[in-house]
Amino acid sequence: MHLSLLKAKIHRATVTHSELNYEGSIAIDGLLLEATGIREFEQVHIWDVTNGARFSTYAIRAEQGSGIISLNGGAARHVQVGDLIIVAAFASMSEDQAKTFKPNLVYVDAHNAISHTNHSIPTQAA
């Protein structure tokens, strides 16, 4: 059996651009792609924390160090500049691989610069 596990996420990134007339995708600062291990053209899920929208698209590289998070094409209809989003990628793996797998979790500040990284999410308490 194969499981689909969270491979990587960019947590609470701020949308900097929304380009309806650009080819569909999400342009992500190259530093964030490298930190997460998300590859260009890889499918990603977008969860808009601000308005609750959830959809998928593919990642393309934006200028390294630019802080750009740009939703393009049809995806631009789901967000507004200034919205907070989570970008997530998943990987399929065997149960044995899943036992030792650790996701790349990248947390960003208000300018989409990396504030810290982790490989686990703290246990949620009441």
Curated annotation (Swiss-Prot):
Mod. after translation: Is synthesized initially as an inactive proenzyme, which is activated by self-cleavage at a specific serine bond to produce a beta-subunit with a hydroxyl group at its C-terminus and an alpha-subunit with a pyruvoyl group at its N-terminus.
CDD domains: Asp_decarbox
Catalytic reaction equation(s): L-aspartate + H(+) = beta-alanine + CO2
Residues binding substrate, per UniProt: 57, 73-75
GO biological process: alanine biosynthetic process; pantothenate biosynthetic process
Active site: 25 (schiff-base intermediate with substrate), 58 (proton donor)
Gene Ontology molecular function, alphabetical: aspartate 1-decarboxylase activity
Domain of life per record: Bacteria
Entry EC number(s): 4.1.1.11
Cofactor note: Binds 1 pyruvoyl group covalently per subunit.
Keywords associated with the record: Autocatalytic cleavage, Cytoplasm, Decarboxylase, Lyase, Pantothenate biosynthesis, Pyruvate, Schiff base, Zymogen
Annotated metabolic or biological route of this protein: Cofactor biosynthesis; (R)-pantothenate biosynthesis; beta-alanine from L-aspartate: step 1/1
InterPro entries hit by this protein: Asp_de-COase-like_dom_sf, Asp_decarbox
Localization, UniProt: Cytoplasm
Pfam families linked: Asp_decarbox
Pyruvic acid (Ser) PTM positions: 25
Cofactor requirement: pyruvate
GO CC aspect terms: cytosol
Main location: cytoplasm
Similarity comment: family membership: Belongs to the PanD family.
Physiological role: Catalyzes the pyruvoyl-dependent decarboxylation of aspartate to produce beta-alanine.
SUBUNIT field: Heterooctamer of four alpha and four beta subunits.
Classification via HAMAP family: PanD
The protein, known as: Aspartate 1-decarboxylase
